[in-house]
Swiss-Prot record:
Belongs to the ABC transporter superfamily. Phosphonates importer (TC 3.A.1.9.1) family. GO terms for molecular function: ABC-type phosphonate transporter activity; ATP binding; ATP hydrolysis activity. The gene is phnC1. ATP binds at residues 35-42. The keyword Thylakoid does not apply. InterPro entries: AAA+_ATPase, ABC_transporter-like_ATP-bd, ABC_transporter-like_CS, ABC_transpr_PhnC, MetN_ABC_transporter-like, P-loop_NTPase. It holds the Pfam family ABC_tran. CDD domains: ABC_PhnC_transporter (cd03256). This is Phosphonates import ATP-binding protein PhnC 1. The keyword Membrane applies. Residues 2-246 form the ABC transporter domain. NCBIfam families: ABC_phnC.
Length: 257
């Protein structure tokens, strides 16, 4: 469970990133966060994992405050949170397998992981994770040789190997073509339904949010302006979230179907 209580973020230049956010996300939900660029989507997601510090309020992960956590407690809390970024965050010169094994770092002694000395059970788990996202054949390929879609699937495999209880995905399909976008979204949905892993994802494309999410949260100027089931997110609702009618480039279109 993720709980945000009166969460605000004000940047040093005075820009308000988040404005008194109150949310509860239950285990096993698939939540899409939508809104215009600058609405606070990335700020919200990064605050959940303490990649940025909030200015006010509290964020609870499974009833423990990540806002006040530090040291070992913070590391242990982050171990349960898988992050997937738009730019993949892979070590390009390393093999796919080594990138996936990085998801096991928090489960092992630091000295061993510095020298890539992982137990065989971790290697087996990493290979199984690659198989689940249909990219096992690339295990010993350098990550720099993969397409964007393949790199994003490696990121998902890393979260699987991490045995994350929740996945936070920051516009993971933004740089992908429609076919690859569907593959990545299918992978995330499968993990959500089969493993009961909570997924919170920032999305640009409105129709993707409607198709894959069970719940949609709309942000505007750092505030929650919509929070409800995906089926209630009509074009009129999105007009309210965005403050204007939808544009063509905010719909991926029939190519995904």
């Amino acid at each position: 469970m993720i709980e945000l209580k009166n969460v605000s973020k004000v940047y040093p230049n005075g820009v308000i990133g988040l404005d008194n956010i109150n949310l509860t996300i239950e285990k096993g939900e698939f939540v899409a966060i939508v809104g215009l660029s600058g609405a606070g989507k990335s700020t919200l997601l990064r605050a959940m994992n303490r990649l940025i510090d909030i200015s006010d309020g509290d964020i609870m992960i499974n009833r423990r405050s990540i806002t006040s956590a530090s040291g070992k407690e913070l590391r242990m809390m982050r171990r349960d949170i898988g992050m997937i970024f738009q730019n993949f965050n892979l070590v390009k010169r390393s093999t796919v397998l080594r990138n996936v094994l990085s998801g096991r770092v928090a489960h092992n002694h630091t000295f061993r992981t510095l020298f890539n000395l992982f137990p065989q059970k971790d290697v087996d788990l990493a290979l199984q994770s690659l198989e689940r996202v249909n990219i096992l054949e690339k295990a010993y390929t350098r990550s720099s040789q993969l397409s964007g879609g393949q790199q994003q699937r490696v990121s998902i495999a890393r979260a699987l190997a991490q045995e994350a209880k929740m996945i936070l995905a920051d516009e993971p399909t933004a740089s992908l073509d429609p076919v690859t976008t569907k593959q990545v979204m299918d992978d995330l949905k499968k993990i959500n339904t089969e493993d009961q892993v909570t997924v919170v994802i920032n999305l640009h494309f409105v129709d993707l949010a409607r198709e894959y999410a069970t719940r949609i949260i709309g942000l505007r100027d750092g505030k929650v302006v919509f929070d409800g089931p995906a089926q209630r997110a009509t074009d009129e609702v999105f007009k309210d979230i965005y403050g204007r009618p939808l544009k063509e480039d905010e719909l991926l279109g029939k190519e995904v179907g």
